[in-house]
Swiss-Prot record:
Protein name (database record): TPR repeat-containing protein associated with Hsp90
UniProt superkingdom: Eukaryota
TPR repeats: 4-37, 39-71
Signal peptide (residue range): none
Subunit note: Component of the R2TP complex composed at least of RVB1, RVB2, TAH1 and PIH1. Also interacts with HSP90.
Gene responsible for this protein: TAH1
N-acetylserine carried by residues: 2
Keyword Repeat (UniProt): yes
GO cellular component: cytoplasm; nucleus; R2TP complex
Length: 111
């Protein structure tokens, strides 16, 4: 397993434990290690959404979407688009329930 994958797994584990700030730190390291890999941006965006930091989440989604042009990143692009919509919808509202999903809602490319 690559260092990138180990760091991603650590971040995902922290996320699942509800340690979103710590997960953000792990995902920052992913972005630093591979700035053109959209996975770090996508994962960080979801952790930021959980923290209620919607503006930063929007920025992460927008940055990540710059790097989703390859076929292998189609699923990540869909996640980024979904998370961008979640964060944009939350900006200005009091609070909306946000849940992580293993399956994307209808209308999002699942490839």
């Amino acid at each position: 397993m690559s260092q990138f994958e180990k760091q991603k797994e650590q971040g995902n584990s922290l996320f699942k434990q509800g340690l979103y700030r710590e997960a953000v730190h792990c995902y920052d390291q992913l972005i630093t290690a591979q700035p053109q890999n959209p996975v770090g941006y996508s994962n960080k965006a979801m952790a930021l959404i959980k923290l209620g930091e919607y503006t930063q989440a929007i920025q992460m989604c927008q940055q990540g979407l710059r790097y989703t042009s390859t076929a292998e990143h189609v699923a990540i692009r869909s996640k980024l688009q979904y998370r961008l919509e979640l964060a944009q919808g939350a900006v200005g509202s009091v609070q909306i329930p946000v849940v992580e999903v293993d399956e994307l809602p209808e209308g999002y490319d699942r490839s």
